[in-house]
UniProtKB/Swiss-Prot annotation:
The keyword Oxidoreductase does not apply. This is Uroporphyrinogen decarboxylase. It catalyses: uroporphyrinogen III + 4 H(+) = coproporphyrinogen III + 4 CO2. One of its GO terms (biological process) is protoporphyrinogen IX biosynthetic process. Substrate binds at R14, Q15, A16, G17, R18, F32, D63, Y136, S191, H302. Its EC number is 4.1.1.37. GO terms for cellular component: cytosol. Homodimer. It is an enzyme of class 4 (lyase). It comes from Neorickettsia sennetsu (strain ATCC VR-367 / Miyayama).
Length: 324
């Protein structure tokens, strides 16, 4: 059964992660990339939320920074500070020399997971959107202003465009390899969509995403986080099959403007799930009421937080199953 076949399908962004005690037990002994690069371990982590919550889809345990790492970027993820990235200053620094070797663990994780995952569960592969990955590697991490990238775009436009082109081509290769190894859905995480001007959004988010979607033969979920009203342009011009919505968008606006173009995914505020179970349940009911005229995928407006109580996740799932 596909995610698209149920009245309400459910999975959570970052569902395999630090809110799960079984994940913490493994992560105490290994770094993040050690876990990602150990296919048996990564597959075990991928399956943990399925075994605990019986969700409708697993998403491979990996990271959007696996791709730029495979293109030669020096990247690490620290438990205390997050991504530590050696900034790139030239598109020529991106190389395919170790590409196959570096993506191999994720592909093997997908293959192992598909064999263990029940056939009625979907397996989601993913990548970061080229814009988001470019911002990470030019900035050397996350920055609330992205001044370095904006300077790069305005002073070295053609080189930035080349970086986006390289990342787009690599993403297409990477995602198609994920499909060959057993993924049956793809999500594109455009986490920094909010940082793009309207012109940048069109050229560096919409156009690359359209190219990626047209090159993939399974349903694609697009997530242009923080894009606001530009969500409509994104869903109309990229041809994504599913539009994943963040929790800043009004439910009636989503239903009126987006649900006519694609299956809606979202959009419970992960802060509510972490800190206010009562309100999380009320908002879950509002979401179900808003979107239930058509099939939709219940998810969060962003990744689940490590502080999230398991009881809150279980309560939300119980409510949704009662309405399915």
């Amino acid at each position: 059964m596909s995610l698209l076949d149920k009245k309400i399908s459910t999975w959570f962004m970052r569902q395999a992660g630090r809110y799960l005690p079984e994940y913490l037990k493994i992560s105490k002994e290994m770094t993040f990339f050690q876990m990602c690069e150990s296919p048996e371990i990564a597959s075990e982590i991928t399956l943990q939320p399925i075994k605990r919550f019986d969700l409708d889809a697993a998403i491979v345990f990996s990271d959007i920074l696996v791709l730029p790492r495979a293109l030669g970027c020096n990247i690490d993820i620290k438990k205390s500070t997050g991504p530590v990235i050696e900034r790139i200053n030239n598109p020529n620094w991106l190389t395919y020399d170790a590409f196959e070797e570096k993506i191999s663990p994720t592909l093997n994780t997908i293959a192992i997971t598909r064999k263990s995952l029940p056939q009625n569960k979907s397996l989601i592969g993913f990548a970061g959107g080229p814009w988001t990955v470019a911002l990470y590697i030019i900035e050397g991490g996350w920055d609330k202003t992205f001044l370095r990238t904006k300077e790069f775009i305005n002073k070295r436009y053609h080189e930035f465009k080349e970086i986006i082109s390289i990342l787009t081509d690599a993403t297409i290769q990477y995602l198609n390899k994920q499909l060959k190894h057993g993924a049956d859905f793809i999500q594109i995480f455009e986490s920094f969509a909010w940082a793009a001007s309207s012109n940048e959004f069109k050229e560096f988010i919409v156009e690359p995403t359209r190219r990626i979607v047209s090159s993939i033969d399974v349903p694609v979920i697009g997530f242009p986080k923080g894009a606001g009203v530009s969500y409509l342009q994104y869903v109309k011009e990229t041809s994504v099959d599913v539009i994943s919505t963040d929790h800043s968008l009004p439910l009636d606006w989503i239903a009126d403007n987006l649900q006519t173009h694609a299956v809606v995914q979202g959009n419970l505020d992960p802060y509510l799930l972490a800190f206010n179970k009562k309100e999380a349940l009320l908002q879950t009911e509002r979401i179900v009421d808003a979107f239930s005229e058509k099939n939709f995928i219940f998810n969060l407006g962003h990744g689940i937080y490590k502080e999230t109580p398991l009881s809150s996740v279980e309560a939300v799932l119980d409510f949704i199953r009662a309405r399915n």
